[in-house]
């Protein structure tokens, strides 16, 4: 899968990410991956559900992967951050 099929979810409004997914799906891409970490996980789930229920009804959730990533801070301390990867496919 090419890197351009991945949408990284951050702090922007949900509809910005929905528009990105819908634009990719309408341009002929059959699978889009949503990736988020930490507090943005709930926003990624919202994006997937809005795309499925309001915009493109034939999109299915192919898989959901959850993981924990270890982030090293500026002072050398490490903290664990949850991550999610949602695969949407037509």
UniProtKB/Swiss-Prot annotation:
Keyword Cell wall biogenesis/degradation appears in the UniProt entry: no
Keyword line: Chromosome, Cytoplasm, DNA condensation, DNA-binding
A GO term, aspect molecular function: double-stranded DNA binding
Highest taxon in the source lineage: Archaea
Gene3D superfamilies named among the record's database cross-references: Alba-like domain
Subcellular location: Cytoplasm; Chromosome
GO CC annotation: chromosome; cytoplasm
Any GO BP annotation: chromosome condensation
Role played: Binds double-stranded DNA tightly but without sequence specificity. Involved in DNA compaction.
Protein family: Belongs to the histone-like Alba family.
Name the record gives this protein: DNA/RNA-binding protein Alba
Organism: Methanosphaera stadtmanae (strain ATCC 43021 / DSM 3091 / JCM 11832 / MCB-3)
Protein encoded by which gene: albA
